[in-house]
Amino acid sequence: MIYVENKDLVIPGEVLADDEYYSGRGTFKENGKICSSLMGLVSLRNKKIRVIPLKSKYVPKKGDVVIGKIKDVRFSMWDVDINSPYSGILPAFEVFGREKKELNKVFDVGDVLFLRVVDVDEVKKVKLGLKGRGMGKFRGGIIVDITPTKVPRLIGKKGSMINMIKDKTNCKIIVGQNGLVWVKGEEDMEQLTKDIIHMIEAEAHTSGLTNKVKNKLSLAIDGELPQEDDYSDDYEELEKPKLQNFKEELEQEEKEEQSKKDSTDFYKVIEELKKKNKKDKPLSYGNNSGNSYILNNR
């Protein structure tokens, strides 16, 4: 039995379903029930239930693009705040190669950069780099901070949401996977874009958000609502790829469980045969070919 619906807001400890469902991330099992371990939104797929956190900290991964702020300049590197519990470092050789320059003449404390995560070691030491299109120091503009888990909603399917905002406001917008967003344009458009971004963050779990954003932009810029278009909402599409291999995972788990069961059943049969043989002599059982297998009764 299921006690919640898809996209319901739940709190820690709330009962979600009976254990005929599969427990996913953000849930735990207790007394035959699946419960939420955090505050978030229910996601149901193929009898698997999980809870997507409303707020979470950014955990860096190799290859991520992030926005960071220089917080210290050292002898051979910069310390960078990447909006995460884990601090980043930008080594000088990632910028200069073998050249030697005074670091604070290139990037100083307070500078905001667009960077790539080059590596993350086992203790979460984050190495950053500047290789890639558009990487480097931002000049002007504002930084908007959102929950990292809402970044896919801001971008939209194939960039649909973020491109719509860019087109209407004529602002340059760069989104970091760590939840920091750089916006540059006319001052009033920067503020409008900031408001729109926070609206998307607050209503990321709702349906019809694309149309809401389009209407707000049109009212603010054109003074009227746009003509009605059939804008499909992209929320469901963003969730699908994460669970595409769920069936394969279940089949693999079932095979492993069956293998363990078969192995256990075999040894149970052998133990039963040993118990039935009360005389101190070997047990034997045969196969169709006439061969016998001997088990020492010890």
Swiss-Prot record:
Locations listed in the record: Cytoplasm
Family note: Belongs to the RRP4 family.
UniProt keyword annotation of Secreted present: no
PANTHER family, per database record: EXOSOME COMPLEX COMPONENT RRP4, PNAS-3 RELATED
Function: Non-catalytic component of the exosome, which is a complex involved in RNA degradation. Increases the RNA binding and the efficiency of RNA degradation. Confers strong poly(A) specificity to the exosome.
GO molecular function: poly(A) binding
Keyword Iron-sulfur: no
Protein's name according to its UniProt entry: Exosome complex component Rrp4
Sequence ranges of Polar residues compositional bias: 285-298
Gene3D superfamilies linked to this entry: 2.40.50.100, K Homology domain, type 1 (3.30.1370.10), Nucleic acid-binding proteins (2.40.50.140)
Domain S1 motif residue range list: 63-131
GO CC, one annotated term: exosome (RNase complex)
GO biological process: CUT catabolic process; exonucleolytic trimming to generate mature 3'-end of 5.8S rRNA from tricistronic rRNA transcript (SSU-rRNA, 5.8S rRNA, LSU-rRNA); poly(A)-dependent snoRNA 3'-end processing; RNA catabolic process; U4 snRNA 3'-end processing
Keyword set, alphabetical order: Cytoplasm, Exosome, RNA-binding
Subunit details: Component of the archaeal exosome complex. Forms a trimer of Rrp4 and/or Csl4 subunits. The trimer associates with a hexameric ring-like arrangement composed of 3 Rrp41-Rrp42 heterodimers.
Chief localisation class: cytoplasm
Recorded name of the encoding gene: rrp4
Domain of life: Archaea
Domain KH: 139-197
Region (Disordered): 276-298
NCBIfam families in UniProt: PRK04163.1-1
